[in-house]
């Protein structure tokens, strides 16, 4: 039998895991030989191994101790049993059922001579003192087992302090204190390890004298107690209540009244359901409705500001401010209720009983008799002399020595502010060159970054942020956003903090900066603490070497240590500015909303005098306002730039069964051995497309979210280093891409929305060179995507997370379906300019004449006419009703055109009124009209999956509300169709790409701005470009991990070198993209490669006669003398289409494997020889040009 002291010890963690006791049956038998000791032994230490060995009264009982309801036992019985257990003096050293230690005849004498320790717990809550007495286990060894026990105090309630003290065994003093009780369903139960007042002790002693061992054993299951002790010594367990728990009754009316009284004034108004807004169960729906109203008010203020009266503007602003406050209060209220609910659920057991989890305890244990010392600091973290724990890690420790989760700081709640916007794009003061830093900007832009001019709005943005203004920037992908904060960070003192959403983006930016010798560092959650500590120490130094510090939004939201270091930097005047990259992630209405981004408003709250620069490439007016509010930018200068990407060529191609053959043909004829992305709908599609392209001879790989992170990183690295050319990916391959020389983006399947399509196409041509965006469209993909949307299986915004995702599923499905239908309308539109369709959707006005035939519709030579199809649409709607709304659009099409196939005859649809009514129309025309009815929501497609085969099908149904309007005669439907009169095509360059796969002739519709140059110099430039690419590949292999090819030289830089043929380092500095740091690192290798290539081309014996390199001045004079009058104008040369096509066949046999360049690069380089500077202006021949 086990005494109470040993029971209490079972709930404490052990410092050293004990070994199991040895079998000692021989000692057991030896003890039983003496008849005098049998009785004593049986009454104290025997555990019966077999049922037959138990006394009669015990053998009949079940091993499991039956649970006793608290209401079935009288309180005196409970107290009597507990007092008996608490005062037992018999010691039991059993550690495993059926095994006992050797019997020491002199146990009682030696035991009484040992020291006993008393644990005194001083409670901070009740002020009472509890103490208990037990053996000093640190000095006690159980003979025969080799086990030793360290001294630990008994487990008692209390949060403040436990101190282990020693008292001699002979000291029987009991301190006066209040007994410790736990309240459970109205029953008070005293803890067994508590000391009692002396007067109570005497009564207990008298009670125990009246009880013998048999009475105790009849009421106690020794087997069960020993089993619990055995399990508890292996793993610390929380104490379990023996009584079933009940939830006390709650007065709901009183609770509701209290909640109503605590509501803020904004939530006390009644909603549409007639109850207070804060108490409505549909509060989340009201939030969305109020956001819609707020969006409408904001759009009215933005779009109709000039037409509104001052009173109306004032009313709208007041209403907008009221709605903002109401939305904020309601969202906070919903969040608080959800948090309370989640905390309640996490603290509620799933069974009918529940573990009683003790409160977290910050304690300190001092035990001089042991070598190991564990301390818990005031912050609740373990601290040991040999441990080096991070300061950011905050843990609480419970009574069992287990650390809980990190303690989160209070969530930041943004404040409603009144924002004053200033349009900066047309403000001439920001473009002024009178600022004191203008000279430094221009010098460092050329010297460090290798740029000879600024791109549009770059200078203006830099001037605004360096003037101390908060700036919001809308700039398209590839517009040069990074320079707007990297250049100011270089010339200004202090640290620029950059918040970027992905670690891969951060690493890419840092690699670029290190190549330019600009010191930068990053902090992320995945870094080792030693690395973070080193960075923090550098930030704290008097002269920190870092200019930029990159962090993720999660780091700002959760790291108190980072905020402390920022405060330190600010106090020393070394905090320059905050930069928020991908700022649209702040907005709940943005397509990439991330909750941690909303916590970034704390930066402006803590550091109001530090300017903020927010950058994004995708933001509507509502998203912009939401971002500015969340970040707390009171006086905000806004810079806008067109989303139009002139270097991208858009096309929509019909998707056929030979789609993969068409893709192979397009790549080989237009972008052979160039880098590209193919976006697919599913993982299976990615693998299938990749495998097929490999069979066609392309260096391709697949990438999707189901791959292991290491495997995905390896594939992306291979692609970034040009070891593979084509990556077939789902949209999981997204924001982390910063490769500038992506020449094509192909969509193998239909995108989910126009926003997503525009963003994915934006990954092509970031270097400003001509690139292709091709979408293969089939209506079957629409059915697949719609089904996956309805099942929640498709999310083409991989980072679209946050609590807005828990909004009404019906509303979310409706929004996603509408976005998908807009994408279908975009694909089905064969008339309007592709750029116009995209930019209008994004809220930008665009003149289609500026497209300059860089999309398939503008290149089309078809003559189109308008046709009234109202009667046809009515017939089709009526036909859907007649078929019972249970058939697909394909079946309706067959019936309408008069088909007599098996399906039509099976359902007797040949007898319907409108069977054959459209036999004069082609399948394409009827299909277009049906799709139009679906996109206009007159017909609705019910997409479902077959249970038998798993295939996806859609059934057409009628939207009665819209159909009523159509049949009323108030709606006329007009569509454009090709004219029956064919017009003569002006040239092959005008061929349309909307009717079939693109070919080299169709691709040649891209504008050619320069005349052809003499063939021999084209060949020299092509040879030079190939040699330079091989040099770049070698440099990448020698560079550290993480350095990509475009970090060293981008393709446009290599093309400029190939065209100009610089022969000195001074001439290399004239190349756009080559700064002083890169010329110092790679200049000698570049010049050596150039020299070798020129010698091979002209021959070593002609070197002195053709090209003289005596001095830079003589080279310049010869260059000026040998340039013909037309060379300066025609320096941006490129090869003719016929010439490049002839080389395509030869290129297929000249491929070099293992990352080497191929002769096919000549053709790719020639097609891109319409060079332009980064600011859009043509590059003039400032370098060396060879004579003909």
From Swiss-Prot:
EC number, as in UniProt: 5.6.2.4
**Where is the stretch described as Disordered?**
1-25, 988-1015, 1102-1147, 1168-1188
What keywords were assigned to this record? Answer: ATP-binding, Chromosome, Coiled coil, DNA damage, DNA recombination, DNA repair, DNA-binding, Helicase, Hydrolase, Isomerase, Magnesium, Manganese, Metal-binding, Nucleotide-binding, Nucleus
- Reaction(s) this enzyme catalyzes, per UniProt: Couples ATP hydrolysis with the unwinding of duplex DNA by translocating in the 3'-5' direction; ATP + H2O = ADP + phosphate + H(+)
Q: Which InterPro entries match?
A: DEAD/DEAH_box_helicase_dom (IPR011545), DNA/RNA_helicase_DEAH_CS (IPR002464), DNA_helicase_ATP-dep_RecQ (IPR004589), Helicase_ATP-bd (IPR014001), Helicase_C-like (IPR001650), HRDC-like_sf (IPR010997), HRDC_dom (IPR002121), HRDC_dom_sf (IPR044876)
* PROSITE patterns reported in the protein's UniProt record: DEAH_ATP_HELICASE (PS00690), EF_HAND_1 (PS00018), HELICASE_ATP_BIND_1 (PS51192), HELICASE_CTER (PS51194), HRDC (PS50967)
The record's statement on gene disruption is: Enhanced sensitivity to genotoxic stress such as UV light, methyl methanesulfonate (MMS) and mitomycin C (MMC), and hyperrecombination (HR) during cell division.
Name what cofactor the protein needs: Mg(2+); Mn(2+)
**Record domain Helicase ATP-binding: where:** 462-637
Report domain HRDC positions. Answer: 1018-1100
| Any single GO BP term | DNA damage response
Alphabetically, the GO molecular function entries are: 3'-5' DNA helicase activity; ATP binding; ATP hydrolysis activity; DNA binding; metal ion binding
Annotated coiled-coil segments of the chain:
311-346
Sites binding ATP sit at 475-482
Gene3D superfamilies hit by this protein: HRDC domain, P-loop containing nucleotide triphosphate hydrolases, Winged helix-like DNA-binding domain superfamily/Winged helix DNA-binding domain
Name the Pfam families on file: DEAD, Helicase_C, HRDC, RecQ_Zn_bind, RQC
Main localisation, per the record?
A: nucleus
DNA repair as UniProt keyword: yes
Which tissues is this chain's protein expressed in? Expressed in roots, seedlings, young leaves, shoots, shoot apical mersitem, inflorescences, flowers, siliques and seeds.
Swiss-Prot/TrEMBL induction comment: By cold. Repressed by abscisic acid (ABA).
Cellular compartments per GO CC: chromosome; nucleus; plasmodesma
- Give start and end of each Helicase C-terminal domain: 662-807
Question: What PANTHER family does the entry give?
Answer: ATP-DEPENDENT DNA HELICASE Q-LIKE 4A (PTHR13710:SF148), DNA HELICASE RECQ FAMILY MEMBER (PTHR13710)
Instruction: Explain the purpose of this protein.
Output: DNA helicase involved in DNA repair. Probably unwinds DNA in the 3'-5' direction. Required for the maintenance of genome stability by modulation of the DNA damage response and repression of crossovers. Confers resistance to genotoxic stress. Suppresses spontaneous homologous recombination (HR) events in somatic cells together with its partners RMI1 and TOP3A. Contributes to the maintenance of chromosome integrity during meiosis. Involved in the removal of telomeric bridges that appear to arise during meiotic recombination. Required to resolve or dissolve MSH4-dependent telomeric associations.
State the similarity comment: Belongs to the helicase family. RecQ subfamily.
Q: What is this protein called?
A: ATP-dependent DNA helicase Q-like 4A
